[in-house]
């Protein structure tokens, strides 16, 4: 079957619209998940006039997530200026502009046809493709047999740095799959499965000739490649310790771009025992900014900080030591006067900036919003992907005063939908610790009206936060008549390291008190009906749900998604052996700690009707513990149900499964919560 070509549409295309009355508004439905599109990967053109971005759609007919590349003018503040660049069927990602602005490149796995670059099995592999802005069909720049994992343009536009995974030395002749031979300490990863010993290395690709030169090698992986401004060097991230599986000790390294065959070995810039990542060069090429974790022994509870290191060598300088908040995605301003970065704080994700000497911290983009990505234009304009309580992610610009929206991807859908009211609240926990959360109420709910059936929804992590980001699930529950309470309990990020670390080796205690305090606040406020309560979550949200229903019978229904209840059973079964050992110790030495924390050992206390869900190839939080919880509850005669999604890892991907999960959420809560007990 012929495939539609990928074509750059002419920039002279025009649109017209006929003024119409706004459609009557209706409540949000499950099917709106497939009407709403996800915007991501904003990339500013070198001339600062355009932003390219990826729009992703969940397609129920094909049961796949599909993506398209779009472009919008940055001087536009109205709908209608955005231009689609790719036809369906390619799902591009990682868009990048060539330095001269002539090409817009992206990663894609093209189906069979010209440029497919299949491997020895005949399967197409991911390659770098390029669109010429002057028009014409996209063409593949690379033809790497094993595919390309990541890439970046050199400053002169003549080369690309590619991240490419090794290939097996000998092909497998058997008709059945090759046996998995395990020798590594870390031998599983969610989304991948069993790990082999193949590694990902860096190559320099010359665009004009197609020449490919390997510049790193060895028994370790390289990632996050970043060209120096003069194009002579490439910074990257790698864990080159004696056993990278036994730690998270990634460092920042620099290698010469012409280091063919390892002739010029990489040079190590950082020696921190924790993770160092996300390198970004200063405009003069003398320094590299990066994200660092200086307390590896407390794993993901540690605060991620901003640091700066001289390329010539010397001790790094921590720029945000006193900030006590997680940061990310650092980028130098074009003139080198400031470093911009993402900043997580109290249910917001702002965009902040700081001087290279660590002074003058400001937050240009802040407020009730969640900024998840940004790029800086040549004229100083900040171009950001921003979500708000009533706006799924869209691209905005900031020129020094206020945010201005430049994409309107979902406006036509949202115009016909009544959304929930969202309120940020603060309340005391049992020990008087102030806790924050968000309460969603149905669109037609009036203050002072009768209390509502209410759902406590718990976030994953545990080190993450509910924010002002558009929350489809909470909006859906509110559209079906529920109040929804979302809490940032201790263990969450956004409130400092001590707040996150408060649940270290103590899950289900302080965080239990905090989420229950959120429910009690909603009851005191007249929002929640204490006789009609439900609880649930996914990942750590499911884990804490299990603790909740062991400790209380206040909830009429529970949904435990991708959860753990018998922690010792997961050692060596999930992909967290390093984290388990750090937090709880080796299970044969500290078994009492493992058993004390596991809700399974008090499973007889559970009387709440419980829906248990998970994916059958989830190696993050394997379905095994869900099966054990289900088996125990069925043996005890409790009301329960187990739903297993075939072929799914930790985050469900198939649109049909996403739809099914939402429908089961609603059906379970409607069955047990809406009728007073």
Question: PLM ranges: what are they?
Answer:
Residues 241-242, 295-296, 401, 409-531, ...:
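Cap/lid segment of the alpha/beta-hydrolase catalytic domain
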Residues 55-68, 85-93, 105-129, 137, ...:
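A flexible loop/linker signature enriched in serine peptidases of the S9 family
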Residues 479, 486-677:
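Active-site-proximal cap/loop segments of hydrolase catalytic domains
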Residues 74-77, 132-136, 206-210, 256-261, ...:
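Short loop/turn segments that connect beta-strands within beta-propeller blades
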Residues 46-47, 99-100, 155-156, 229-230, ...:
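Residue-level detector of Asp-centered blade-edge/turn motifs that repeat once per structural unit
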Residues 48-51, 101-105, 157-160, 234-235, ...:
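Hydrophobic beta-strand positions that form the internal "hydrophobic ladder"
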Residues 22-63, 67, 71:
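Mature N-terminal segment immediately following signal peptide/propeptide cleavage
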Residues 43, 161-163, 169-170, 179-182, ...:
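Non-catalytic accessory segments flanking enzyme active sites
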């Amino acid at each position: 079957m012929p495939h539609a070509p990928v074509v750059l549409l002419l920039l002279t295309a025009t649109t017209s619209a006929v003024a119409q009355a706004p459609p009557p508004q209706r409540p949000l439905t499950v099917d709106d998940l497939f009407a709403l599109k996800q915007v991501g990967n904003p990339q500013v053109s070198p001339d600062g006039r355009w932003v390219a971005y990826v729009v992703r759609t969940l397609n129920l007919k094909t049961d796949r997530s599909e993506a398209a590349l779009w472009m919008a003018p940055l001087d536009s503040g109205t709908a209608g200026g955005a231009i689609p660049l790719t036809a369906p069927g390619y799902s591009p990602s990682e868009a990048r502009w060539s330095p001269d602005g002539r090409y817009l490149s992206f990663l894609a796995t093209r189906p069979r046809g010209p440029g497919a670059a299949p491997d020895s099995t005949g399967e197409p592999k991911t390659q770098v493709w390029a669109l010429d802005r002057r028009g014409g069909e996209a063409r593949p720049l690379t033809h790497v047999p094993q595919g390309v994992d990541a890439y970046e343009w050199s400053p002169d536009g003549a080369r690309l740095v590619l991240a490419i995974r090794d290939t097996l030395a000998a092909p497998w002749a058997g008709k059945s799959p090759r046996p998995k031979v395990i020798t590594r300490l870390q031998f599983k990863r969610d989304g991948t499965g069993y790990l082999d010993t193949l590694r990902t290395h860096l190559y320099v690709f010359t665009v004009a000739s197609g020449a490919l030169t390997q510049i790193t090698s060895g028994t370790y992986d390289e990632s996050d490649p970043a060209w120096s401004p003069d194009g002579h060097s490439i910074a990257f991230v790698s864990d080159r310790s004696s056993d990278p599986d036994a730690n998270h000790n990634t460092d920042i390294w620099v290698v010469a771009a012409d280091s063919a065959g390892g002739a010029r070995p990489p040079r190590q810039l950082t020696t921190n025992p924790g993770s160092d990542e996300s390198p970004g060069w200063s405009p003069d090429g003398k320094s590299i900014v990066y994200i660092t974790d200086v307390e590896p022994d407390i794993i993901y509870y540690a605060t991620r900080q901003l640091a700066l290191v001289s390329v010539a060598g010397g001790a790094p300088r921590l720029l945000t030591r006193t900030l006590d908040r997680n940061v990310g995605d650092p980028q130098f301003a074009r003139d080198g006067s400031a470093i911009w970065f993402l900043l997580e704080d109290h249910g917001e994700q702002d965009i902040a900036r700081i001087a290279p000497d660590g002074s003058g911290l400001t937050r240009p983009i802040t407020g009730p919003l969640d900024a998840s990505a940004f790029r800086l234009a040549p004229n100083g304009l900040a171009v950001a992907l921003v979500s708000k309580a009533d706006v799924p992610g869209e691209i905005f610009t900031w020129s020094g005063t206020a945010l201005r929206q430049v994409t309107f991807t979902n406006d036509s859908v949202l115009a016909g939908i009544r959304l929930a009211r969202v309120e940020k609240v603060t309340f005391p926990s049992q020990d008087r610790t102030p806790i924050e959360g968000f309460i969603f109420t149905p669109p037609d709910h009036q203050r002072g009206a009768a209390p509502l059936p209410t759902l406590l929804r718990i976030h994953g992590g545990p080190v993450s936060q509910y924010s002002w980001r558009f929350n489809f699930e909470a909006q859906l529950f509110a559209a079906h008549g529920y109040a929804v309470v979302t809490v940032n309990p201790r263990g969450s990020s956004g409130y400092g390291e001590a707040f996150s670390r408060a649940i270290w080796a103590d899950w289900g205690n302080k965080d239990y008190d905090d989420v229950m305090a959120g429910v009690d606040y909603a009851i005191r406020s007249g929002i929640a009906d204490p006789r009609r309560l439900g609880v649930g979550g996914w990942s750590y949200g499911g884990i804490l749900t299990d603790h909740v229903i062991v400790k209380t019978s206040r909830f009429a229904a529970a949904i435990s998604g991708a959860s753990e209840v018998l922690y010792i059973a997961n050692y060596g079964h999930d992909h967290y052996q390093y984290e388990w050992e750090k937090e709880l110790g080796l299970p044969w030495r500290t078994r009492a700690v493992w058993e004390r924390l596991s809700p399974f050992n008090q499973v007889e206390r559970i009387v709440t009707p419980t829906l248990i869900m998970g994916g059958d190839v989830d190696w993050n939080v394997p379905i095994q513990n869900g099966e054990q919880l289900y088996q125990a509850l069925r043996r005890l005669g409790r009301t329960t149900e187990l739903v297993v999604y075939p072929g799914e890892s930790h985050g469900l991907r198939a649109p049909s499964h996403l739809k099914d999960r939402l429908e089961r959420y609603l059906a379970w809560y409607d069955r047990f919560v809406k009728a007073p007990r």
